[in-house]
Amino acid sequence: MLDKIGIPKRLAWGFLGVVLFMMGDGLEQGWLSPFLIENGLTVQQSASIFSIYGIALAIASWFSGVCLEAFGAKRTMFMGLLFYVIGTAAFIVFGFEQLNLPVMYVTYFVKGLGYPLFAYSFLTWVIYRTPQSKLSTAVGWFWIAYCLGMFVFGAWYSSYAIKAFGYLNTLWSSIFWVCLGAFFALFINKDRFEKKKRKRSETAEELLKGVTILFTNPRVLTGGIIRIINSIGTYGFPVFLPMHMAQHGISTNVWLQIWGTIFLGNIVFNLIFGIVGDKFGWKNTVIWFGGVGCGIFTVLLYYAPVFSGGSLAVVSVIGFIWGGLLAGYVPIGAIVPTVAGKDKGAAMSVLNLAAGLSAFVGPALAWLFIGLVGAQGVVWIFAALYLASAVLTKCIHIPEEKAVKEETSPQYAS
């Protein structure tokens, strides 16, 4: 049954493990910033914590492939688990409870090294163990598991756990969920990953190529920039948007439910825009649905509670559409490897790095500009960047799409 819908049966427990791990990792995303601000930190200080976390994500995303080649999938995933547990426990005990900013910087950085090593190593495992004819679907299911856990279940769980356990214990419970996820992915999952034998020089050469391609192929660099812009709202909004919503009658708990609904829309439309991209064209999909669509609805999401009097229905509908339009960037995962020619592996490294950097850039923009132009100004900056990504996409020349579509796996966009 699972094989028929594209999930490799031998790795089914691993997919469940990714859902649970990412649920634990993402459960504080929608409420940590407003909690820290309510307890004495400034918006800029809160944003700086998330920016440093984003740097850790970028580093771990970049090196996840190299670690897998050196240590194997399960060991690399276990390393990710250790980074997460140690970083989270230290963050709570020495940073969170005492609001010690320097300690929070260090410990949240360590935590940020965790999930890329865990999740992206499993993704590589899936790629190695799935027949080519079913690879695109299997990769799609991985991203569904990833988004369901991090953005949907994590937010929904927090909206109830905070009421039942309080903020501190909810954060502690994240360790339970990531350990449960690791148990399914590493122990209940009995599949064995046999990594390809490669010389150390070959691994180093591939890593270096992931840097040099940015200079030798400007189209790959442009695609990486577009991928960063794709997720600036995903990681930037949680820094300040919950406080804006609260000013208009939408509490943090209700906001968490809205945030989960937003990314439920993202998951649904990730599937839809994969099909739309094939029919409407990769570039057209990114330009009109991703760039222009996100630019418009980013602004609407900010002003929705203002003009609707805090209407939950209005904000939820606009948020659902915004989350869906983020998926308009799905074809960038096909465009970048295509324009890279033979260097598809290096192109995927660039996309992984860009996905990690977006977790830095979004909060960093809030940190830099919220004191100058306020939350409203930051939203307009986000909108302008989304529109700029449409222009950048227009400038990328790609070969005839029909000749390469069947060779390319999707990159989910959030």
Swiss-Prot record:
Residues 1-11, 69-75, 129-136, 189-219, 277-286, 338-343, 399-414 are cytoplasmic. It is found in: Cell membrane. It is a multi-pass membrane protein. Keywords: Cell membrane, Membrane, Transmembrane, Transmembrane helix, Transport. Gene3D superfamilies: MFS general substrate transporter like domains (1.20.1250.20). NCBIfam families: 2A0118. This is Putative transporter YoaB. It comes from Bacillus subtilis (strain 168). The gene is yoaB.
